Amino acid sequence: MRNFAVIMSITSIIRPFFRSRYRAIERYGTHAEEIQRKVLAHLLQRAADTEWGKRYGYESMRNYEDFAKKVPVNTYEELKGYIDRMRHGENHVLWPGQVKWYAKSSGTTNDKSKFIPVSREGLHDTHYAGGQDAVTIYLHNNPLSRLFDGKALILGGSHAPNRS
């Protein structure tokens, strides 16, 4: 009688995590409005003590209608002064604490790049989660995939500081 070792692939070991995540992603489609209301309430609560949040009274806002009524749509140029202050280290301007990361646009308006603030919370809750969700959906749609069992190429943005 021979001994056979069962070798589990990395993909098969982590697949249950992705199945669980896929159920949460499906819920986004069936409960989108409820989830968006909760996210807005969380963001308003988090930003209530910032300069921007105090200016527009985030603390008293209870729903999207309050937000839409009190906070005007702003252009990048109207926000640039706030963003520049944040880039120079000022805290609690548009978001609580210090924002250290900025996404740099390719410059579509006025031929100049724009710096979009990316908080630590935003980095984790959207950028990182978005990558995980893309893999989750891929594995769901390709159940025979062995994505993590071989080589992979991952492209990302620069971590080099931009001093301009």
Where do the language-model regions lie?
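Nucleotide 5′-phosphate-binding alpha/beta core
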Residues: 1-104, 110-164
